[in-house]
Design a protein with these regions (language model features):
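Flexible "stalk/tail and boundary" regions
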Residues: 1-7, 12, 22-83, 90-143
Length: 143
């Protein structure tokens, strides 16, 4: 399970050093992709496979095809270099509004890792923390 928050830099070549705590848990063949809320997500292979399989069906509608095409075209398997860095493609960075160089926030999000543009994370996090109790109450009421 991925937990924690780390502030790191994306260098001028688009390289991001994955925090060591996450790197230890990510197996070979993990994927980086665009996710919801204009963030990038790192998925272990088994989670990526489950997500990709959920988009495959013989009778896809136009929305499902669009989501599948966008997701697949913006996703890439990676192997960190010797310093634990991965390269975020320019198109991935553009859609997540991450420059190079840039400060980003890498968070554990349970089964995956998310990469946020720093100012957007700071705003989102402050708002979400302020609503935590009422959001948790709503989640619990639907169980």
């Amino acid at each position: 399970m991925f937990t924690g928050t780390y502030r790191v830099r994306v260098d001028d070549k688009g390289r991001l050093a994955i925090p060591a705590a996450f790197r230890k848990q990510l197996p070979e063949g993990s994927f980086v992709s665009l996710s919801l809320d204009r963030v990038l997500a790192i998925y272990p292979p088994e989670l990526w496979t489950a997500l990709a399989d959920s988009l495959l069906s013989p009778l896809q509608g136009p929305d499902q095809r669009e989501v599948a095409r966008t997701l697949y075209s913006l996703s890439e398997a990676f192997e960190p270099d010797g310093q634990g860095r991965i390269i975020l493609r320019p198109e991935q960075r553009r859609l997540a509004e991450i420059g190079s160089p840039a400060s980003v926030v890498v968070i554990g999000s349970g089964s995956r890792v998310e990469i946020w543009q720093e100012a957007r994370w700071d705003s989102y996090s402050a708002d979400a923390q302020g609503r935590f109790t009422e959001s948790a109450d709503r989640v619990n009421s639907t169980r």
